UniProtKB/Swiss-Prot annotation:
The lineage of its organism: Eukaryota, Fungi, Dikarya, Ascomycota, Pezizomycotina. The genes involved in HC-toxin biosynthesis, called collectively TOX2, are organized into a diffuse cluster that spans >500 kb. All of the known genes are duplicated or triplicated within this region, with some variation in copy number and chromosomal location among different race 1 strains. Disruption phenotype: Reduces pathogenicity of the fungus on maize. SUPFAM superfamilies: PLP-dependent transferases. Pathway: Mycotoxin biosynthesis; HC-toxin biosynthesis. It comes from the Eukaryota. Alanine racemase, part of the diffuse TOX2 gene cluster that mediates the biosynthesis of the HC-toxin, cyclic tetrapeptide of structure cyclo(D-Pro-L-Ala-D-Ala-L-Aeo), where Aeo stands for 2-amino-9,10-epoxi-8-oxodecanoic acid. HC-toxin is a determinant of specificity and virulence in the interaction between the producing fungus and its host, maize. TOXG catalyzes the conversion of L-alanine into D-alanine, an essential precursor for the production of the major forms of HC-toxin by the non-ribosomal peptide synthetase HTS1. Belongs to the threonine aldolase family. This is Alanine racemase TOXG. GO terms for cellular component: cytosol.
């Protein structure tokens, strides 16, 4: 048996030989962006690369429920190490990661979870917190319009002994939050506030790699400040699926049982984790700080599109910090449906005012979207508004 199979890693010669074979095959979807090349709806639509398929073909096939899959175990240990945490646990989706984290942090009932009113856990996780944790969500509009700060927690957290109230026991944050980078110093303030008030913390880091790419902080700096952190490999990193929870050993052990209880245990987990590992290495790097230029190039594309929109007379709802652009369609009298239809005319897939860039968007799609901006904005905004009445 080769060393590669024993340790769950792929050496360069093995990888290149498999890639040569894969590249000679016809009608293979892996490594082909397909419709993702012109899809600005989200970065979840990225397609896995041939290198990821190569990693899958060379993975170990142990049983992860029995903790016998080396590829999975080594990947969990690697991500935990570069994040500065005791242990990591791989799960199939970011939603599962978030919900397992929140469930693990519920120590008493009733339990209130304070989070941004725009958070993924509120709008896009099928009410998982009520089903799995029996917790009450306490949504708060961030006062800076971007992300939660200590001032928001001080104003809205319920820390009273009043028996009429559901006490705030957990604070859940996102980074990035709608594309905005949460500074390390702000998370440090929240950590200190939470400790003083006996509140647990969770970070939805589905796009944490985007924040690290900006130079705002390393994985270790961010992950060291929060009780439980979840990171995603299937967005701009391009893995077919997968996320990881990072925290202390005791909590992770507890969550392994809960993961099994909700059907998240994986048998031959290496088939999934090998691709996720390769996605991390390809599009981020091996360490706690970014090594690949992939994400930074995507940020440049996002900023260019934002500049084109404003140069043609459009307005932005939020500053562009990473890979997400928020267009103010109302300011130019454009309905969401009109914008989507116009994109379809030019061959790009849109979903309203949020434009999400990723590494598989090609230059032709970028130019086509700029043409959409021009077509939309060349009309008189007042006329557009009147036509909607």
């Amino acid at each position: 048996m080769s060393n590669m199979v024993l340790n769950g890693n792929i050496d360069k010669s093995d990888r290149n030989s498999i890639l040569d074979i894969l590249q000679s095959l016809e009608n293979i979807a892996w490594g082909q962006p397909g419709s993702a090349r012109c899809d600005f709806r989200s970065d979840v639509i990225t397609r896995p690369s041939l290198r990821m398929l190569s990693a899958v073909l060379k993975t170990t096939l142990g049983d992860d429920v029995f903790r016998e899959d080396l590829t999975t175990a080594h990947f969990e240990a690697h991500v935990a190490e570069i994040s500065g945490r005791e242990e990591g646990m791989f799960v199939i989706t970011g939603t599962m990661a978030n919900q397992l984290c929140l469930h693990a942090l519920v120590s008493t009932r009733p339990c209130g979870i304070l989070l941004s009113s725009e958070s993924h856990a509120i709008h896009y996780e099928a009410g998982g917190s009520s089903m799995l944790s029996g917790a009450m969500l306490q949504p708060v509009q961030p006062s800076n319009g971007k992300y939660l700060r200590v001032e928001d927690l001080e104003e809205h957290a319920i820390l009273t002994d009043d028996v009429h109230k559901c006490p705030t026991s957990i604070v859940s944050m996102e980074n990035t939050a709608g594309g905005a980078v949460v500074p390390v110093h702000e998370l440090r303030r929240i950590r200190d506030w939470a400790k003083q008030n006996n509140v647990r913390t969770h970070l939805d880091g589905a796009r944490l790699f985007e924040a690290v790419a900006t130079g705002a902080g390393t994985l270790k700096e961010y992950c060291s400040l929060i009780d439980l952190v979840s990171v995603d490999f299937s967005k701009n990193l391009g893995a077919p699926m997968g996320a990881m929870i990072l925290g202390d050993k005791k909590l992770i052990q507890q969550m392994r049982r809960t993961r099994k209880g909700i059907g998240g245990g994986m048998r031959q987990g290496g088939v999934i984790t090998a691709a996720a590992r390769e996605a991390l290495f390809e599009n981020f790097g091996l360490g706690a700080e970014i090594e690949s230029q992939t994400l930074l190039q995507v940020h440049k594309v996002a900023k260019r599109l934002g500049e084109e929109w404003t140069r043609k007379g459009g307005k932005l709802s939020k500053e562009i910090e990473t890979n997400i652009i928020w267009l103010d369609l109302d300011a130019v009298g454009i309905k969401k449906s009109q914008f989507i239809d116009k994109g379809r005319e030019y061959g790009v897939i849109l979903d309203g005012c949020r434009i999400v860039c990723h590494h598989q968007i090609d230059i032709y799609a970028v130019e086509a979207l700029i043409d959409v901006f021009h077509d939309i904005l060349k009309a008189d905004p007042i006329k557009n508004k009147n036509s909607d009445r």
